């Protein structure tokens, strides 16, 4: 009998024995045991907590950014954000926020500021993109659940999520480098302020034009139909599932990378636009047809032209 089979046998005995109610544990212990028995529930809890924590941290950064922004450089929603309380933060979070919001790496190296900005962009990806990846994660959990019923080995769904997020980590590093470049050459004020003039119009134009591209359509088709990709590439090996998660992350990045550029035109830490982009990504991946995508592209192009005319 293999190790996996012995583990399954022991698990079955435990589940059918007198200890399956975990009565010897306290309430928290029983709750944790219930979560641990269900990979699908585990993934839902971890993803939900990650998304909630990401939004909490992003909101705190946005409030501090709105308060510190110079007059005349307000981003949309700053007036409302200034009325929100600035909660006391641990020292390490205060330093992290300072690195994200500072106009230059004052008491830290450029690498430290780049690392902080990478973490900030990754938080944005978790907050806005992970919800739209829920159908893909749920589909994997359903296939994995069916395999477990048949006593087949399965890689944990969190391995798939880790592969997915690794792609966004790499993208976050590139967006952090772009943030530093925009701050050095095109920022009107502090770090993360909205880019104006040609820089802002260029970001909106690229995002708008990409909505009409064949690559956007191909990536969107893959994101809308995860079952065929997951089923065709199914494996019990964690490394294969990690790579599968990376593949799904690349399709998602192909759908949404251009929309991230919109954040440069409205202020990188604009939580209202973050929420709007996250909601649009969710709707776009669930909708049939290209109407939402093309409509968003047209709006972005008109916006870019208007910004360019107003700023000249």
Model regions and ranges:
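Acidic, low-complexity central loop/insert segments
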Residues: 146, 150-181
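Functional transmembrane helices that embed catalytic/metal-coordinating motifs
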Residues: 115-142, 162-171, 210-234, 238-285
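...captures the hydrophobic TM-helix bundle architecture rather than a specific catalytic motif
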Residues: 42-58, 163-175, 307
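Histidine-/acidic- and/or cysteine-rich, low-complexity loops and terminal segments associated
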Residues: 3, 12-122, 146-149, 187-191, ...
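Residue-level signature of transmembrane alpha-helical entry/exit and packing/kink sites
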Residues: 43, 109, 113-117, 156, ...
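Juxtamembrane boundary at the C-terminal end of a transmembrane helix
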Residues: 64, 305-312
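Interfacial loop-to-transmembrane junctions
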Residues: 279-302
